Amino acid sequence: DDLLLENNTFYKDVIDAYIRQPQDHTSIPYSDHTIPGLVYLSDYDLGTNDVAYYDQDVANYSLSTDQYEAWNKGWSYRNDGVDLQENSDATNSNGLHISFVEKDEWVNYTLDVQQSGFYNIDLRYATPQSGGQLKYLINGNDVSEQITLSNSGGWTYFTNHSTNNVYIQEGVQTFKIFVLGTTSFNMSSLNFSISNDPPPAMQAMGAITVSDERSVRLALNHPLNAQTIEVSDFEFLINGNTSNIESIQIDPTNSLVLVITLSDYLHYQDDLKINHAGGVINSVYNSLLGTLVNFPVQ
């Protein structure tokens, strides 16, 4: 009887883990996420830990420690490492939420964005304590500042936190929720809606090093006009010392990003900062990037 289809439940994540993931170390969508629209956070991409998501607890170590530890501590919906629990929230909910979040954990979602523009993002969350922290990234680049959550009244009392005027480009994009702090919270959905506000002032959102060990990606909140970026308008500091900048270019695949290439190689423990004079780099919304003083690079 166990072999009869009517006596079995289909779990697409289990099938994907057995058949695709051993040969294909990429992520694929779990569900279709059309933006503008609602994304249920339980429907993060399919893939292994550190590819589609990162969770601190992803395995059962009972054989080596003689102690059982669940990888999905919520015991619901999926067999991956992300902790999912059921809830009774009636707003923007499919009855599930991500729980037991810890610092540096993250989840990815493949979005099909119908039009470029500024979006308001409403996170549905619950927590009995203030101070939960997270940020949003698209294709590895920061698109939000640090987000700090307030006490919602309890683990089961869900409310919204709005992050407004986030620029998202049309097309298929990978959206990441990254947990920053040690204060835990539950999160169930994201609602993306087109902003009706005037464009915000242009600003730098974040900067990261890349794998060639000589380049840095500086993410902005506005797409840029085609223009020449003068090296002399920037200063790059490595451990407090000025480093020679070879070139600064707009990323040809993402006009929200400046690529800064250096003469010196970068090392893991280096303290990296960016200074910029301001008032010369123009966006498609005719907004100028302001002054940057000791802007940190991750």
For each predicted feature, which ranges?
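Ser/Thr- and Asn-enriched, surface-exposed coil loops between beta-strands
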Residues: 103, 171, 212-214, 252-256
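Acidic, Ser/Thr/Gly/Pro-rich low-complexity segments and short DxT(G/T)-type signature motifs
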Residues: 199-207, 273-298
